[in-house]
Design a protein with these regions (language model features):
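Ser/Thr-rich, Pro/Gly/Ala-heavy low-complexity intrinsically disordered linkers and tails
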Residues: 1-49
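Short, surface-exposed polybasic-aromatic patches that bind anionic ligands, especially phosphate groups
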Residues: 42-347
Length: 347
């Protein structure tokens, strides 16, 4: 959830909250030849391999999402900002089973035909990809999953749609993300907006533009994904939400929040779990997530509940009540256990 501040722009990318049409049925991954991987393979582990999902490298290794921040200095306003972001609130794992409607699902595949896009709220901040005389055509199959689970309806929550086009794998895949997705009818997807991320590039969105996330960031690179946790290593920063956002931002974010109150957190602000945080008594899967927070940190990406960590939508999170175990451990991790990092000047 987020409060959107729409800034005027002359270009075209995409934006924010969530609305529309029921996703595929709950019987499992949609049966579509164009959707070939709802669950990624175990990530590569070789040196310099970067993050690999469904055969695609998720952004270059030197991208901010993949940056080791364990040695970065603290933000000069660390104490003042921390006082405004509920430092006594514990973390919450905001993900879980697809059939229960938890987490943000993603789909992947190649060869899907172009579908027309009807961006009803923010077409001026949505990425153009013209075909058939219309400005927006994305190769997203009709069976791509929508956030909220198989029983969700338009207007229920944020209804993000994330589609990884594996054409060009491993180094030149394309990520399509939409917010407030109403559904697919007669060859057309309807959503509030759409963003395209070329995963072989470190290019940022147009300055002042939002995306499917309020900050103008991609969502998929920051998800806690089931397969990574089970493999015992997450090699990227993690997405999370806070209640308030300042009306400036810091790269790689490109969009401002609505608050003019001094020392509120900015979109794109980077956080890091303290190196001396004691996690030895926690479940090994929880430790995998927390170690990533120490090495790669977290990005503040959207307004929502304080200290909600975002993960993927996968029924396997319910195996042995894994998500319950992680959330039990997260009750012993609070906002005050994190450090705010100095990654550049606000814009």
């Amino acid at each position: 959830m987020r409060a959107h501040v729409l800034l005027a722009s002359t270009l075209t990318l995409a934006a924010c909250n969530g609305s529309t049409s029921p996703g595929p049925d709950a019987s499992g991954p949609p049966h579509d030849a164009n959707v070939d991987a709802y669950r990624p393979p175990l990530p590569d582990s070789g040196p310099g391999s970067g993050v690999v999902v469904a055969g695609c490298r998720i952004l270059p290794q030197d991208n901010p999402w993949n940056q080791d921040v364990s040695a970065l200095p603290l933000h000069p306003r660390h104490a003042q900002i921390m006082a405004n972001i509920s430092p006594t609130t514990h973390l919450h794992a905001d993900w879980g089973a697809w059939t229960d409607g938890y987490g943000i699902p993603w789909s992947s595949g190649s060869g899907a035909p172009n579908a027309h896009m009807d961006f009803v709220d923010y077409p001026d901040e949505s990425d153009m990809r013209p075909c058939d005389g219309v400005p927006f055509c994305y190769p997203i199959p009709s069976t791509a999953r929508i956030e909220g689970g198989p029983a969700s309806n338009p207007g229920d929550g944020d209804r993000h749609l994330l589609y990884l086009d594996t054409t060009g794998a491993p180094n030149d895949c394309t990520l399509y993300e939409m917010w407030n997705t109403n559904g697919f009818t007669a060859g057309t997807w309807s959503a509030s907006n759409g963003a395209i991320f070329h995963l072989g590039s470190n290019a940022l969105r147009t300055e002042s533009w939002t995306s499917a996330d309020a900050a103008g960031l991609p969502i998929m690179p920051g998800l806690v994904r089931y397969d990574e946790v089970m493999a015992g290593e997450i090699r990227h920063a993690v997405r999370f939400t806070l209640q308030h956002a300042f009306n400036h931002h810091i790269h790689p974010a490109t969009h401002d929040g609505p608050s003019s109150t001094a020392d509120m957190p900015l979109y794109g602000l980077r956080f890091r779990l303290r190196a001396d945080f004691d996690m030895h008594a926690m479940d090994p899967h929880t430790q995998t997530i927390l170690r990533a927070m120490q090495r790669y940190g977290l990005f503040f990406a959207d307004q929502g509940s304080n200290w909600y960590i975002t993960g993927d939508s996968d029924d396997r999170w319910n195996d042995g009540d894994l998500i319950g175990t992680i959330n039990g451990d997260f009750r012993n991790v609070t906002g005050g256990d994190f450090e705010i990092l100095d990654t550049g000047s606000q814009i």
